[in-house]
């Protein structure tokens, strides 16, 4: 039986401290937030209990320790919290079942023969050799299903788990068709993050090494004039983020963008993110701007790939067939079962929000984790920056990746992590999609994401291509509702984290409490003074004075 979140050691004194200190951290980790005092809030809860109505706590806890322990136990036992906080009742535990998804009529089932080769999919010998040079010898399920149909000229919607080889599922047929008619501009690939665009760019260059493919990268953080010149030279493939390509369409002039009007292939990688029309940071307006100058749908092939099938993507399956076009084909591999790899082990650790950093430092140094390559996800850039400072002061080999970093530093930091110069990457969700770093064996959710689909993409950075991996989520008392939502989405419960011979709470008190508290103050001071990691003051551009 899997222990329930928030109730594993309910009678221990350490757990009382955890529960009394836990607060909402679903979208932030700011332990400086102040709320209504615990004493007043408990008094209100007791009066509600007497009236027969008890509501969950809504405010963060502070450090008031005047209340009696027995009163605390009684109040906590009456809180109308989700079932995962309550004690386990024999026979009351139910398995979380993923809802079956009915596949559309035009869905193609990928071949299941494990002996299928790329040659059997009509892939040209030079491409097969390039794939073998990259240690890719047999196609994955999504590649088996998509490559033959794309070569036939059909539009595609491909859905498959993270780490299943979706990039090669569209890169291989595009390069094969390009080699038969190497015109420019042959393909445009749109993707939501700069790092993913860079990775796709590198994969296109690697697989096309026997040929003279000219591919360019068009992303934010780089000089627009240089990019405009490169676009004007008519490369064969453009890999871009929609925001920067839309900027060129609006400002770079017809001479620069006229080549886009003859594109043969348009790829929307991570289509669920690109087509999301809700919430801040929607990329849909920029995507529409990009599509406005590309050939109409009847004159190009459109390929959509995603790990999470959203309503926006699903709606495209039922669009009417345009005259002169073959029906859109849909290839979904394993999307009707679990949304995460079977080789991924999901776990959680109960932590008080006031001591998350202490638990993190201690957890990273346990015998099982001290040598692992780790991606640590946060919800905010400020949290990622702060943790980068803190973990470096605690002598961890760490780097960071988030949107507030200059593009050059983002590239350098990711390169350090790939080269194992840093074993920990502190990142926001810019690193959650598409990045393929085989050495990553552990993903930590320092903050639980609000959207369960973001959780799927985060934990998908490990356990890729059949390898094993672990994902550990830090769960505060008020994160339980969110954790349950995530479990329902992925179709599997999280297990309580355990390591033989390790009591995390004891180690926190014994080894980390004083040390981490001191380093927290130093890290916060560095961040407040605007210093770089390591203590140097950040350089700022200064205007030249003309005397």
Curated annotation (Swiss-Prot):
Compositional bias of kind Polar residues: 1-13
Compartments it resides in: Nucleus, Nucleolus
Annotated ranges, domain Helicase ATP-binding: 147-327
Motif (Q motif): 116-144
Annotated InterPro entries: DEAD/DEAH_box_helicase_dom (IPR011545), DEAD_box_RNA_helicase (IPR050079), Helicase_ATP-bd (IPR014001), Helicase_C-like (IPR001650), P-loop_NTPase (IPR027417), RNA-helicase_DEAD-box_CS (IPR000629), RNA_helicase_DEAD_Q_motif (IPR014014)
Disordered as annotated region, ranges: 1-93
The protein's name: ATP-dependent RNA helicase DBP8
């Amino acid at each position: 039986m899997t222990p329930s979140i928030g109730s594993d050691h309910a009678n221990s004194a350490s757990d009382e401290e955890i529960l009394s200190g836990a607060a909402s951290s679903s979208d932030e980790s700011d332990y400086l937030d102040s709320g209504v005092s615990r004493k007043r809030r408990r008094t209100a809860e007791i009066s509600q209990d007497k009236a027969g109505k008890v509501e969950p706590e809504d405010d963060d806890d502070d450090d008031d320790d005047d209340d009696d322990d027995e009163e605390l136990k009684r109040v906590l036992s009456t809180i109308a919290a989700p079932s995962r906080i309550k004690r386990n009742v024999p026979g009351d535990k139910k398995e979380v079942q993923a809802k079956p998804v009915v596949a559309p009529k035009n869905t193609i089932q990928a071949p299941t023969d494990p002996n299928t080769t790329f040659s059997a999919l009509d892939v040209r010998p030079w491409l097969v050799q390039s794939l073998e040079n990259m240690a890719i010898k047999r196609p994955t399920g999504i590649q088996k299903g998509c490559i033959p149909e794309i070569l036939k000229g059909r539009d595609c919607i491909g859905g498959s788990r993270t780490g299943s080889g979706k990039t090669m599922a569209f890169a291989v047929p595009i390069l094969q068709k390009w080699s038969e008619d190497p015109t420019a501009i042959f393909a445009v690939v749109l993707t939501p993050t700069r790092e993913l665009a860079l990775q796709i760019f590198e994969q296109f260059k690697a697989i096309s090494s026997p040929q003279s493919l000219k591919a360019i990268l068009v992303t934010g953080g780089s000089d627009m004039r240089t990019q405009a010149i490169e676009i004007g030279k008519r490369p064969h493939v453009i890999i871009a983020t929609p925001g920067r390509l839309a900027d060129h369409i609006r400002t770079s002039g017809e001479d620069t963008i006229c080549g886009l009007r003859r594109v043969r292939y348009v790829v929307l990688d991570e289509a669920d993110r690109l087509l999301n029309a809700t919430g801040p940071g929607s990329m849909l307006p920029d995507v529409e701007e990009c599509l406005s100058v590309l050939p109409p749908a009847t004159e190009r092939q459109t390929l959509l790939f995603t790990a999470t099938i959203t309503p926006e993507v699903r709606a495209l399956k039922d669009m009417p067939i345009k005259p002169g076009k073959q029906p859109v084909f849909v290839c979904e591999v394993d999307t009707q079962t679990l949304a995460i790899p079977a080789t991924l082990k999901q776990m959680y650790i109960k932590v008080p929000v006031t001591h998350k950093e202490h638990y993190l430092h201690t957890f990273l140094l346990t015998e099982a984790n001290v040598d692992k390559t780790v991606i640590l996800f946060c919800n905010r850039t400020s949290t990622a920056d702060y943790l980068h400072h803190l973990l470096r002061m605690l002598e961890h080999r760490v780097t960071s990746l988030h949107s507030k970093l200059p593009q050059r530093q983002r590239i350098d930091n990711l390169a350090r992590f790939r080269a194992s110069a840093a074993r920990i990457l502190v990142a926001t969700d810019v690193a959650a999609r598409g990045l393929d770093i085989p050495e990553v064996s552990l993903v930590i959710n320092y903050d639980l994401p609000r959207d369960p689909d973001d959780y799927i993409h985060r934990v998908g950075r490990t356990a890729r291509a059949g390898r094993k991996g672990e994902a550990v989520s830090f769960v505060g008392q008020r994160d339980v509702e969110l954790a349950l939502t995530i479990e329902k989405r992925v179709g599997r419960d999280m297990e309580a984290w355990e390591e033989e011979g390790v009591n995390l709470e004891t180690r926190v008190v014994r080894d980390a409490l004083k040390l981490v508290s001191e380093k927290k103050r130093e890290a916060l001071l560095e961040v407040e003074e605007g210093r770089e990691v390591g203590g140097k003051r950040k350089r700022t551009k200064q205007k030249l004075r003309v005397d």
